[in-house]
């Protein structure tokens, strides 16, 4: 792969990630709040014990719409874009690093394994995910802290630089890498996503090639091709997210301030013991509602930019 090709994939990946992050930020905030252990968004329901006449409070997790309503009422619409700054700072380099690493790794592995085989896509996706996570974890930690910083209207909100200073004063440099073990576990989601995506993309390409050969036409990119890529991305991301979602909840808990959660497996075990298996999928609906369009937008933007820059 030439230096120009690498730069094209870097730029295209950055563009795709940025567009997706801006359009889906409110859903990201709601999802992060639902994943956290914060009690401020919980609802206490009173149940009467008809035998003894006593009342018992039962704490339940709010749904996405209730969470959205609480944020709008107590904090205002601007709170739905909490953490967008770090998100934009992180998403462009993260996606750029990811796509560049993925493309480079795939090109090299094609010389070792069968070109564009499942092994190639799996290893490339894993290596790209590992590289991007290691490089950008501090940015995502700050983003999560800002999104969990619930303040009422009129109260001074914590800024990104204040959050950085607070993390450093409390935990030092290692504090910026909390939750990274859960992110590494999440590489499985990335691998599943790209294997399915590349498989669907290949099938679509084979179908179009066969169609153009039958009609004796030259193969050119059309709007329907990008729609197909968006559907491929949405389908693959839905499957991958549903399978690997628990790591998202664990990661959010590990990134909370002053948390009792220390490691990936300790957090996973504690969640199941204290809140049940359902807690591992808290916020999944919101996450899917956000991730499906976000991934579709990101992948289509990436493919479009690569196509335009390569002429």
Swiss-Prot record:
Inhibited by pyridoxal 5'-phosphate, 4,7-diphenyl-1,10-phenanthroline, tannic acid, and mercurials (mercury dichloride, Mersalyl acid, p-hydroxymercuribenzoate). One of its GO terms (biological process) is pyrimidine nucleotide import into mitochondrion. Keywords: Membrane, Mitochondrion, Mitochondrion inner membrane, Repeat, Transmembrane, Transmembrane helix, Transport. GO terms for cellular component: mitochondrial inner membrane; mitochondrion. It catalyses: UTP(in) + CTP(out) = UTP(out) + CTP(in); CTP(out) + UDP(in) = CTP(in) + UDP(out); UMP(in) + CTP(out) = UMP(out) + CTP(in); dUTP(in) + CTP(out) = dUTP(out) + CTP(in). It holds the Pfam family Mito_carr. It is found in: Mitochondrion inner membrane. GO terms for molecular function: pyrimidine nucleotide transmembrane transporter activity. It is a multi-pass membrane protein. SUPFAM superfamilies: Mitochondrial carrier. Solcar repeats lie at residues 4-108, 116-203, 224-308. Its main location: mitochondrion. The chain crosses the membrane at residues 7-27, 41-57, 111-131, 180-200, 226-246, 291-311. InterPro entries: Mit_carrier, Mitochondrial_sb/sol_carrier, Mt_carrier_dom_sf, SLC25A33/36-like. It comes from the Eukaryota. Widely expressed at moderate level. Expressed most strongly in pancreas. Belongs to the mitochondrial carrier (TC 2.A.29) family. PANTHER family: MITOCHONDRIAL CARRIER PROTEIN RIM2, SOLUTE CARRIER FAMILY 25 MEMBER 36. Mitochondrial transporter that imports/exports pyrimidine nucleotides into and from mitochondria. Selectively transports cytosine, guanosine, inosine and uridine (deoxy)nucleoside mono-, di-, and triphosphates by antiport mechanism. Catalyzes uniport at much lower rate. May import (deoxy)nucleoside triphosphates in exchange for intramitochondrial (deoxy)nucleoside mono- and diphosphates, thus providing precursors necessary for de novo synthesis of mitochondrial DNA and RNA while exporting products of their catabolism. It is linked to Hyperinsulinemic hypoglycemia, familial, 8: A form of hyperinsulinemic hypoglycemia, a clinically and genetically heterogeneous disorder characterized by inappropriate insulin secretion from the pancreatic beta-cells in the presence of low blood glucose levels. HHF8 is an autosomal recessive form characterized by episodes of symptomatic hypoglycemia provoked by protein feeding, and persistent mild hyperammonemia. Affected children tend to have recurrent generalized seizures. This is Solute carrier family 25 member 36. It comes from Homo sapiens.
